[in-house]
Amino acid sequence: MRISIKKILDNESTAGIFLLAAAVFALIFSNVGFLHDIYRHFLELPIVIGVSDYKLDKPLEFWVNDALMAIFFFSIGLELKRERIEGQLRHFSQVFLPSFAAIGGVIFPAVIFAVINFSDSHALRGWAIPTATDIAFAVGVMALLGRRIPTSLKIFVLTLAIMDDLCAIVIIALFYSTALNFTYLGLAFVCFLVLLVMCKLKIPQKIPFVIMSILLWIFVLHSGIHATIAGVAAGFCIPINTSRGNSMLKEMESSLGYFVNYVVLPLFAFANAGVDMRGMQISYLFGPVPLGVMLGLFLGKQLGIFTFSWFLIKMNIVGMPDRANFKQLYAVAIICGIGFTMALFVDNLSYGGSDLYHHTDKLAILLGSIISGVVGYFVAKAVGNKPKKGIKNEYN
């Protein structure tokens, strides 16, 4: 039984299913009378951590969005470092095409959103909402396709999603920070330096890294930079190998995997996908903000990723991914329009949970992501390789 449960949890599509289920439950709770009140009380549940003057008294929604998501970003930092040193980001030739494609996948959606919302300065704060790919959902769709899509394109999507996350981190740090408190920023920098020194010394104990990472998060939280950036910074400071020869980074990445995929991200989806559609009119979805989000995710991502990839390949700067063709490349570009987690996260930073747009900004994220996933799946299935009978899905 334990082995079968582990096999299910290790399956690439399971995390995406959990995320989708959490989003569906959030929608149900938000739109059913008595459940709506339970849902709101749940998110507003006060949680106090600390003692006396040194405590944080915040609602559950804050702890999910700013603390648990910092752990998610910490896992991204670990993944980026591992891939940079030992994985697909190590070789320039392997990373150049998906990196360049990721840039296109950020520029096109942002431009589409900005053009549609150019006359509204407040709406323009959401320009980055449709720029990121949700790696859990994208990989889940790829898993359902199995051998219809060559392995090289699956690696392309994984690398692109990683680079997308890196772009999102830079965007959050540069464009979604408030007025800076240089005292706390200085303290955060000291913590970061201490983490770097401990990494250089390859200290084998995890506790010092955990303590310094928590302090870094607290100081960044009060500095004006979004607290999740502390998670990424701390992740980069975990040593690949310690003085005892074990890989602390891989151990942490492994131990956090299930927690992030099956607790952090579903909780985040449940806390943020709850769009109250009672009294919502269909016409609201055709407002500039939701239209910019949906078109950015569905059209912007696929056009940006495919156009930038096509240019590099046609100019013979890079080659086509092994055993792939342009039709298959276009299909996976559509799949990359699944924004969901990061899009909801940036939406919160942009509009602070405001209902100014009748929550259609969040609904547009869900619709744009669903359309991208469904259309991308069927296009990929139509243009993909025909799997031979008797060969199992390589993800199983």
From Swiss-Prot:
Alphabetical GO CC annotations of the entry are: plasma membrane
Q: Does the keyword DNA-binding apply?
A: no
Q: Where is the signal peptide?
A: none
Q: Principal localization?
A: membrane
Its annotated compartments are: Cell inner membrane
Please list the disulfide bridges. none
Q: Which Pfam families match?
A: Na_H_antiport_1
Q: Where are the transmembrane segments?
A: 15-35, 60-80, 96-116, 126-146, 155-175, 179-199, 207-227, 255-275, 290-312, 329-349, 363-383
Q: What does this protein do?
A: Na(+)/H(+) antiporter that extrudes sodium in exchange for external protons.
User: What is the name listed in the Swiss-Prot or TrEMBL entry for this protein?
Assistant: Na(+)/H(+) antiporter NhaA 1
Q: State the Gene Ontology BP annotations.
A: regulation of pH
Gene Ontology terms, MF aspect:
sodium:proton antiporter activity
Tell me yes or no: is Ion transport among this UniProt entry's keywords: yes
Q: Say which family it is in.
A: Belongs to the NhaA Na(+)/H(+) (TC 2.A.33) antiporter family.
Keywords attached to this Swiss-Prot or TrEMBL record, sorted alphabetically, are: Antiport, Cell inner membrane, Cell membrane, Ion transport, Membrane, Sodium, Sodium transport, Transmembrane, Transmembrane helix, Transport
Annotated Gene3D superfamilies = Na+/H+ antiporter like domain (1.20.1530.10)
InterPro entries annotated for this entry? Na/H_antiporter_dom_sf, NhaA
Provide the organism lineage as a comma list: Bacteria, Pseudomonadati, Campylobacterota, Epsilonproteobacteria, Campylobacterales
